[in-house]
């Protein structure tokens, strides 16, 4: 069946998705704009209506609608409250209660934007979805596969968040901004009088007011947030923590203990509700084991390959080797020890600008 040129653009009200919609319209696509209404706590609904900054606030809806009207495309607000809670919020809560540190944006991309949003697009008889992500998709005729690449603007590249996309999802996705710099995108918005050229990039967890995830967890699952011991690696008690959900690997501030030297969270023992602290050297690992693997250029990896990996959104890439580990897991071995490998975070594998794939960090391997 021939693909049509109708595309559903996820419009947050920000400059990137606004310009993406404009570009596609100018390229001859039949563009429909849509804003995703996500879940908030009842007490945060008023903040949703008042918040002028948030990517998912009512103000953002108004901005997206104004842009859609300006460029002359239909616009819908789609209700994703239930699936967002089921796939993103529940996972966020569960991961923290297990002593892990999740990245809800990766879960949102995987289960909401490229699962539920794609379903809505098909219901609207669209053959593509599009977003304002700074990444590129190329079809490789030799491999007969869609490939994902880092965007031209390496300071805004978002491929780390996209490494869970499948071949079926990549085939139905357009990234109009992949070959542009952020400054160019802002200039395009200004030249076309979209009214969003100067909007700042969103930094917060969209469903957590003020990015205070500790307060959020305390309010939604107070029965699971309990104080417990702070221990050293030998099991000696050094103090008491407020609840493991308030801490992450590598954290130094806010531990509430004074030992005459800096100490860091080096492990979280959720089974015993204990926080393990140690010196900075104890934060370093020689590798990690990743689960929930998705590979893009290959069906599977059979032998060790040289890669670079990214273990959190704002971290530098690390030269490594990648090899099978069994049970649908992969082993990453760093060429040099790496600090604060954090279970629950996403890990993305690269060769130059090509995204090999990604997964979720299960655990660090040998501490240095």
Curated annotation (Swiss-Prot):
A Pfam family annotated for this UniProt entry: tRNA_Me_trans_M
SUPFAM superfamilies (UniProt xref): Adenine nucleotide alpha hydrolases-like
Compartment annotation: Cytoplasm
Spans annotated as Interaction with tRNA: 156-158, 312-313
Gene Ontology CC annotations of this record: cytoplasm
Site location (Interaction with tRNA): 133, 345
Domain of life assignment: Bacteria
InterPro entries, sorted: MnmA-like (IPR004506), MnmA-like_C (IPR046885), MnmA-like_central (IPR046884), MnmA-like_central_sf (IPR023382), Rossmann-like_a/b/a_fold (IPR014729)
Binding site for ATP: 10-17, 36, 132
Disulfide bonds: 108-206
Family: Belongs to the MnmA/TRMU family.
Protein's recorded name: tRNA-specific 2-thiouridylase MnmA
Gene name of the record: mnmA
